[in-house]
């Protein structure tokens, strides 16, 4: 191929991610032209409604997928946590890139630690997964929906609308915004379990051999192992991107540490488990853990969670 067209959202973070992949492809394939095609998704346009209430899968991916299926673009760069586990016919996950920090973080102008937040503090997040885990730790908090790009969220924090907001450490690091905020508290995995695929970039592409061959070098073995477990877990539970599911797999040497949680958005009921396993079990352990959760009532919890959202 002489040219690859990348479908990308227009947010600053999405453009950073796409520029990063563009540079890697150009470095790998000398002389290849790589073009970014910016577009808005449903999730970018509807900003006055919590994501869970908009409904449907692929809120941040469908328009990009449509452009690939029409042949207007060849690949799309996504935050893997936004990518549904089932792909439209003709598309597939071509590569999973090395992961950034997978953890969630609390950003605040006044409070250095999560435990410093006063009773009834206002915390901004749209994620039901984050809301659930915040309320499990601190039922007194007032969790307020917060939509928009990272800059919009930071502006609202600085204007005093919130005592704290929750962001992914990956986005904080990629946009290099640590100097812009007073306090960053990073949650441990025992406090807040991330979303499937958090911190990884996923390359979606048309299911054509030439495109897949040109992008295969982007795959990172460790990221593939970890996110396979996480995506298998969510796939078996039949959970979308907007339901309260946390799953984190972390590979160190030949050992994988896994933490998972499923529950109601208000934190009143949840199922949580942790385990360690060997690297060679990565293709089965996510599914097995999901079936254990199902035996404990996870699917019923998720149905109730969708009704509450």
UniProtKB/Swiss-Prot annotation:
One function term, GO molecular function aspect: hydroxymethylbilane synthase activity
Per its UniProt record, what InterPro entries does this chain match? HemC (IPR000860), Porphobilin_deaminase_cofac_BS (IPR022419), Porphobilin_deaminase_N (IPR022417), Porphobilinogen_deaminase_C (IPR022418), Porphobilinogen_deaminase_C_sf (IPR036803)
Alphabetical keyword list: Porphyrin biosynthesis, Transferase
Q: Matching CDD domains, A to Z?
A: PBP2_EcHMBS_like
Q: In which pathway does this enzyme or protein participate?
A: Porphyrin-containing compound metabolism; protoporphyrin-IX biosynthesis; coproporphyrinogen-III from 5-aminolevulinate: step 2/4
Q: Please give the coiled-coil regions recorded for this protein.
A: none
Gene Ontology CC annotation, any one: cytoplasm
SUPFAM superfamilies, per database record: Periplasmic binding protein-like II, Porphobilinogen deaminase (hydroxymethylbilane synthase), C-terminal domain
Q: Which reaction does it catalyse?
A: 4 porphobilinogen + H2O = hydroxymethylbilane + 4 NH4(+)
What's an example GO BP annotation here? protoporphyrinogen IX biosynthetic process
**What PROSITE patterns does the database record attribute to this sequence?**
PORPHOBILINOGEN_DEAM (PS00533)
Miscellaneous field: The porphobilinogen subunits are added to the dipyrromethane group.
Q: What does this protein do?
A: Tetrapolymerization of the monopyrrole PBG into the hydroxymethylbilane pre-uroporphyrinogen in several discrete steps.
Report the NCBIfam families cross-referenced here: hemC (TIGR00212)
- Name the record gives this protein: Porphobilinogen deaminase
Designated gene of the protein: hemC
